[in-house]
Curated annotation (Swiss-Prot):
Chain residues that bind NAD(+): 35-39, 84-85, 121, 144, 180, 297, 321
BP GO annotations: DNA repair; DNA replication
Keywords: DNA damage, DNA repair, DNA replication, Ligase, Magnesium, Manganese, Metal-binding, NAD, Zinc
Residues at which Zn(2+) binds: 418, 421, 436, 442
Pfam families assigned to the protein according to its UniProt record, in alphabetical order: BRCT, DNA_ligase_aden, DNA_ligase_OB, DNA_ligase_ZBD, HHH_2, HHH_5, Nlig-Ia
Domain BRCT: 601-690
Domain of life: Bacteria
Protein name in UniProt: DNA ligase
Catalytic site: 123
Role description: DNA ligase that catalyzes the formation of phosphodiester linkages between 5'-phosphoryl and 3'-hydroxyl groups in double-stranded DNA using NAD as a coenzyme and as the energy source for the reaction. It is essential for DNA replication and repair of damaged DNA.
Keyword Ion transport assigned: no
Taxonomic path: Bacteria, Pseudomonadati, Pseudomonadota, Betaproteobacteria, Rhodocyclales
PANTHER family (UniProt xref): CHROMOSOME TRANSMISSION FIDELITY FACTOR 18 (PTHR23389), REPLICATION FACTOR C SUBUNIT 1 (PTHR23389:SF6)
Cofactors, names only: Mg(2+); Mn(2+)
């Protein structure tokens, strides 16, 4: 290595450097290096740890996601109970005065005594968590549970980028950081968009999505849900000099690199608390996360001890929630918004109504099925709620106030073409969501289309990440994937966090991507329901892009594993002239791949057989095993089903193994796979009951 002959020293340096960049990016929101440079550092650390496994440490950034799913969540007893905070029943300013009066009476303070000093914080709508650090390293994360006993969720919490795996600076022997795991609203919306895109159930609100992620048995599921964290207190600690005030404690936690909310304020007496409450009420709609109130705490720790607890609630703290947020108004019309995945979402246009401190004029109606289920019609009086305490939602109509029989809203009849780009709008038979078919062309879908196109398994354009794509699209430098191949050094070098060197690296990566394969190119187009495996099947079957473009639904269904739904998605994609125009622009930009005659029927020792790979194989990576199977005519799927012929199981095989056993799928290990590929016959030591010993 250029700077360190000692791999251990270099690994330690990389871990510290990556941790600093993570803290700057995820906690401070002030990125310090380009994405491509961060990726380079991360890969270098991965390479060192792969070559020297003995250097792997639990606080390494490479270890945030990993390991097999757990069989169950293990109970954890809290050394210091995680108690709940009393909720003030009076949501008005009088509720604040009631709390202050109780505190003063408990402390024996009279009218002539000084005002009590308080710290005001936000009441986050998330999941309470306890993070235990020993000598600075995160060793356990546990849910609140019943306050006495929670559940060990360390495997999932390690995937949260905001939570440091190692504390900054000189850390105490033991410190348990208490706080809230939550999901930002924009992350929640993006997650639900992905759920809709995959045909999966959407989440009701960010809190449910966050809580469900934290309690998953498989950390890979949690890693796919973008979670955040704020600290607000302390549990057990040893070797830690406890500050004199709650405010100082939060400052100390922030110095350890733990995220602490900036919206907090020290004040004296009830009037300061009331002012904070009202100021946050006016601000809450602009916050990037959900809150359902504020929390007041006596600031001095010695007074907290003196006040103590009553019925397992601290006397020195109270939650002050905001009032209920439902009102009635008239539905003036229904508009449509096009999301980044092409989903058309109906939006209620409302007569202005004041709900929970803000004036609401629009609210989500989700999709056609929800409109039908709620029977909401233009002209109705409707109940409006700020769902999740933030996002306005139409709950339903007030039927007794309906006049006559207003017509029902039909999205496809009202919007046969995309309101953004004019492409055809389509909706699958069993799908709730209608979509714009102009995926490569539609401005609303540009960012998502570009990120998918540049992905590692698509065109593999290294360095083209979220932030850069956002800049390129917002500055109107790139409108379609074809525009990437027109980029020059001047246009890139002027972008934020993109110097001349980074620009040259990106241009080199774009140039390298011109030489690809037909399968990668098809996958990069982002055709709905066309994954990597289907793209390979299409490339193999048709042999050329022109043959694919000319295929109708009937011809497409001749491709192995392409059924009516996928065939319809492909046909609709290429029936949209805007998409074909971008495809031709990409060809004109010099993208190249080998083409040939349509493939003959698959041959080889496992031709026509479907495999699923799970667990860690002794000598083969999953990609290597997949390539071997495909080279012998087989196909690799990502999930076990009745159509699966063989499950290739390695160490720490997860839920796929159990499902394969339930379905009676043949199970082989790596040796069994090699024998199968060589002879086409299953080894007699492998069977449907499990992996051979």
């Amino acid at each position: 290595m250029p700077l360190f002959a000692d791999a251990a020293a270099r690994a330690a340096t990389l871990r510290a450097e990556i941790a600093r960049h993570n803290h700057a990016y995820y906690v401070l929101d002030t990125p310090t290096i380009p994405d491509a440079e961060y990726d380079r550092l991360f890969r270098e650390l991965q390479d060192i740890e792969a070559a020297h496994p003995e250097l792997l440490t639990p606080d390494s950034p490479t270890q945030r996601v990993g390991g097999a799913p757990l069989p169950e969540l293990v109970p954890v007893r809290h050394a210091v109970p995680m108690l709940s905070i009393r909720t003030e029943t009076d949501t008005t300013a009088q509720g604040v005065r009631n709390f202050d009066t109780r505190v003063r009476n408990a402390l024996g303070l009279g009218d002539g005594d000084p005002a009590v000093e308080y710290l005001s914080e936000l009441k986050f709508d998330g999941l309470a968590i306890s993070l235990r650090y020993e000598h600075g390293v995160l060793v356990r994360a546990a849910t609140r549970g019943d306050g006495e006993t929670g559940e060990d969720v360390t495997h999932n919490v390690r995937t949260i980028q905001q939570i440091p795996l190692r504390l900054h600076g000189a850390a105490p022997a033991v410190i348990e950081v208490r706080g809230e795991i939550y999901m930002r609203r924009d992350d929640f919306e993006a997650l639900n968009n992905r759920q809709r895109e995959a045909g999966d159930k959407v989440f009701v609100n960010p809190r449910n999505a966050a809580a469900g992620a934290v309690r998953q048995l498989d950390p890979r599921i949690a890693a796919r849900r973008p979670l955040s964290f704020f600290a607000y207190g302390l549990g057990e600690h040893a070797g830690f000099d406890l500050p004199a005030t709650q405010a100082e404690l939060l400052t100390r936690l922030a110095a350890f690199g733990v995220p602490v909310c900036e919206h907090r304020e020290v004040s004296s007496g009830p009037e300061g608390l009331i002012a904070f409450h009202d100021r946050i009420a006016a601000l809450r709609n602009e916050l990037p996360y959900d809150i359902d109130g504020v929390v007041y705490k006596v600031n001095r720790v010695d007074l907290q001890r003196e006040l103590g607890f009553v019925t397992r609630e601290p006397r020195w703290a109270v939650a002050h929630k905001y009032p209920a947020q439902e009102e009635i108004t008239r539905l003036a019309g229904i508009d449509v918004q096009v999301g980044r995945t092409g989903a058309l979402t109906p939006v209620a246009r409302l007569e202005p109504v004041f709900v929970g401190g803000v004036t609401v004029t629009n609210a989500t109606l989700h999709n056609q099925d929800e409109i039908d289920r709620k029977d909401v019609r233009v002209g109705d009086w409707v109940i409006v709620r700020r769902a999740g305490d933030v996002i306005p939602e139409v709950v339903g109509p007030v039927l007794e106030r309906r006049v006559g029989e207003p017509p029902r809203f039909n999205l496809l009849a009202s919007y046969p073409t995309c309101p953004v780009c004019g492409s055809h709008v389509v909706r699958g038979e069993d799908e709730a969501v209608a979509r714009c078919s102009g995926g490569l062309f539609c401005p609303a879908q540009r960012k998502q289309a570009l990120l998918h196109f540049a992905g590692r398994r698509a065109m593999d354009i290294e360095g083209l990440g979220d932030k850069l794509v956002e800049q390129l699209v917002d500055a109107s430098i790139v409108k379609t994937p074809a525009d990437l191949y027109k980029l020059g050094i001047l246009a890139l070098a002027n972008l934020e966090r993109m110097g001349e060197k980074s620009a040259q690296n990106l241009l080199a990566a774009i140039e390298k991507s011109r030489n690809t394969t037909l399968a990668r190119f098809i996958f990069a187009l982002g055709i709905r329901n066309v994954g990597e495996a289907t793209a390979k099947d299409l490339a193999r079957h048709f042999g050329s892009l022109d043959a694919l473009l000319a295929a109708d639904e009937g011809a497409l269904q001749q491709v192995p594993d392409v059924g009516p739904v996928v065939a319809k998605c492909i046909a609709e994609f290429f029936a949209e002239a805007h998409n074909v125009e971008v495809v031709e622009q990409l060809r004109a930009a010099g993208l190249r791949w080998e083409e040939g005659a349509p493939a003959a029927p698959a041959s080889g020792s496992v031709a026509g057989l479907t495999f699923v790979i799970t667990g860690t194989l002794p000598t083969l990576s999953r990609d290597e095993a997949k390539a071997l199977i495909e080279a012998h005519g087989g196909k690799v799927s990502g999930s076990v089903s009745k159509k699966t012929d063989y499950l290739v199981a390695g160490a720490e095989a997860g839920s796929k193994l159990a499902k394969a056993q339930d379905l009676g799928v043949d199970i082989v290990d790596e040796d069994g796979l090699r024998r199968l590929l060589e002879s086409g016959e299953q080894s007699p030591i492998n069977n449907k009951d499990g992996v051979p010993e």
